[in-house]
Every structure is written in structure tokens, then in C-alpha cells.
Amino acid sequence: MFEKTNRMNLLFDFYQELLTTKQKAYVSFYYLDDYSLGEIAEEFEVSRQAIYDNIKRTEESLEKYEEKLGMLKKYQQREKLFSELEAQLTKKNFLDEQVKDTLEQLKNID
Amino acid sequence: MFEKTNRMNLLFDFYQELLTTKQKAYVSFYYLDDYSLGEIAEEFEVSRQAIYDNIKRTEESLEKYEEKLGMLKKYQQREKLFSELEAQLTKKNFLDEQVKDTLEQLKNID
């Protein structure tokens, strides 16, 4: 469960702009703010089942986008290589202020 | 015109998986293979107008995806910073084989 929440949060970070306003709202209440389905249902005055179905479909959409675009996967590959690069540069004493700064700028582009 | 073709090719590279089979086909004939609308119409046995409308809508979709996800923009920002980093490392004699290799791997993740 924790792993799924974590993955959904990450996918949401990358693809939320492709979701509808309603999808965004439900998913962020559920995964980011940890509301229960019942609480979200009350908040939006719709049935618990409607919330459940909507979130379920959104999860499928997010996985579909990831399958097609792979933004999360590429991000994680990049993170791993940035760490390796940083370790290599540090070990060789190559990580001076300028190099460090450029590397930081690179890492800040998600 | 050349600039637009170039941009459409780049956007197509990033977002083609989000297009329908037909959209992909028309756009790649038009922008990648430089067919005329008339030639594509003949190829698919539909009207020139239908091809035009479809490609026009696809262009709008590609721009919309870029607006929402910014994969091309981020790619270009990254390219620029990779060049800077490489220049800095080269100038300081820090670009040895290992560092070069890790950097190449990083650049190969689009």
C-alpha cells in the first residue's frame, strides 16, 4: 500500500496536468492528503463508489501515460546517474563550486 | 516553414505515443517524409481537406502536450547545461574517460 501511494504520488507529480479538474481533486485528496474514500465522498457530495471508480480510472490513466512517455522512469535513471557522476567527481576532487552549481541546475530540471 | 517543421518533428519525437495511429501516419508523412497534402490524400484515399484538418488538430494536440508537460523545453534546457558542464570539465582537465562515459549515459536519456 505504501509503495503504491508512493508511486501514485510520483506519477501524479509528472502527469497531473493531463488529468481533469475532478480527477486531480480526488486523487490529491486520496493519495496526497490521505483522506478515505468515504471522507472524499462526503466532501464532494457524491457516492463512495463514484469516487472509487474515478480514482481507479485515474490510476490507470497515470500508468498508461507512464507506459507511453516514461517520464518517471527516465527521471529515476537520471537521478541514479547524477549520483554516480557526483561520486566520481567528488572522489577525484573535481567537484569544485562551478561544476557543483551546473550539476545542481541540471538536477533541478525534472 | 522550416522552423515549424523542425519544431513539429521534435514534438512528434516526444509525444507520438499519445497520438492515434492515423494521426501518427499523417504527421510522419507530412513532417518527417515531406509528402504534400495531396500526396497523402492519394495514399490514404481520403480528401485533401480531411488530411489538412487532421494534421492541424494533431499540431494543436502536440503543442498542448508540450504546454502541459514541457518535455521538449526541459530537454533543451538540459542540453544547454550538459554542454556547459562538458566545457567546464574539459577546460579544467576533469573530463576523464569515466566521467565522460557517465555524462554520455546521462545525455542519452531523452
Curated annotation (Swiss-Prot), chains A, B:
Concerning InterPro entries, the annotation shows:
RNA_pol_sigma_r3/r4-like, UPF0122, UPF0122_fam_protein, WH-like_DNA-bd_sf
- Record-given protein name: UPF0122 protein lwe1821
Organism's domain of life? Answer: Bacteria
Q: Identify one Pfam family in the record.
A: UPF0122
What's its job? Might take part in the signal recognition particle (SRP) pathway. This is inferred from the conservation of its genetic proximity to ftsY/ffh. May be a regulatory protein.
Q: Which Gene3D superfamilies match?
A: Winged helix-like DNA-binding domain superfamily/Winged helix DNA-binding domain
Q: Which organism is it from?
A: Listeria welshimeri serovar 6b (strain ATCC 35897 / DSM 20650 / CCUG 15529 / CIP 8149 / NCTC 11857 / SLCC 5334 / V8)
The record's annotation in PANTHER family points to: UPF0122 PROTEIN CBO2450/CLC_2298, UPF0122 PROTEIN YLXM
Q: Which family does it belong to?
A: Belongs to the UPF0122 family.
